[in-house]
Regions:
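C-terminal subdomain of alpha/beta-hydrolase-fold enzymes, centered on the catalytic histidine
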Residues: 97, 120, 128-131
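An alpha-helical appendage that flanks or caps ligand/catalytic pockets
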Residues: 1-108, 140-163
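Structural preference for beta-strand elements that scaffold enzyme active sites
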Residues: 1-3, 116-119
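C-terminal helical cap(s) of enzyme catalytic domains, especially alpha/beta-barrels
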Residues: 125-145
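Outer-membrane beta-barrel pore domains
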Residues: 93, 120-123
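Flexible loop/turn segments at secondary-structure boundaries
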Residues: 9-14, 124-130
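A structural motif corresponding to the C-terminal end of an alpha-helix
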Residues: 108-115
């Protein structure tokens, strides 16, 4: 099974959701992001200046996340940029918007990428997962993209039900 990690950020309006995203993302400092990224890479990034272009580094430990060193527009990113983005969402897609637009984004992602589902990370707790369950899941259910009930008793049962 292929499950994609996402970070849904849900608001009453698109502007409200963007504001929540900005507030969340602003909490992450370069130093904090570097610490998280260093731990995930098992490599101390504090030895490099913040303006280091990550694609130019050849250390073997840095190669496994190489695709994350390029911005959405194709521009190579600095260590500071990569660190902040990694600290904000650990490299997961932030799906931001109203419940309907988040459901639309999820549906489109699956249509394009394929896969079997999503794993969610919350930007805050309590509240973020509850918002998703109460506001997005009903939309996905109406579209036939989320089941109404589960017949198994274990995670394995749930994941292999449609094999």
């Amino acid at each position: 099974k292929i499950l994609f990690g996402i970070q849904p950020i849900i608001g009453r309006t698109e502007a409200d959701a963007k504001k929540k995203q900005q507030q969340h993302n602003d909490l992450v400092t370069v130093e904090g992001g570097k610490a998280i990224l260093s731990a995930h890479l098992d490599f101390d990034l504090s030895q490099f200046p913040d303006d280091t272009i990550m694609l130019e580094r050849n250390e073997p430990q840095l190669q496994r996340m190489r695709t994350r060193y390029v911005d959405f527009d194709g521009r190579p990113m600095t260590l500071a940029e990569v660190a902040r983005r990694h600290g904000q969402s650990v490299g997961l897609a932030q799906m931001v918007g109203t419940p309907k637009s988040v459901a639309d984004q999820m549906e489109e992602f699956m249509r394009v990428a394929g896969g079997d589902g999503f794993m969610l990370t919350a930007i805050h707790s309590p509240g973020a997962i509850e918002d998703f369950v109460d506001k997005v899941v009903p939309i996905l259910r109406k579209r036939g993209l989320v089941r109404e009930e589960y017949t198994g008793t274990t995670l394995r049962d749930h994941l292999t039900q449609f094999d």
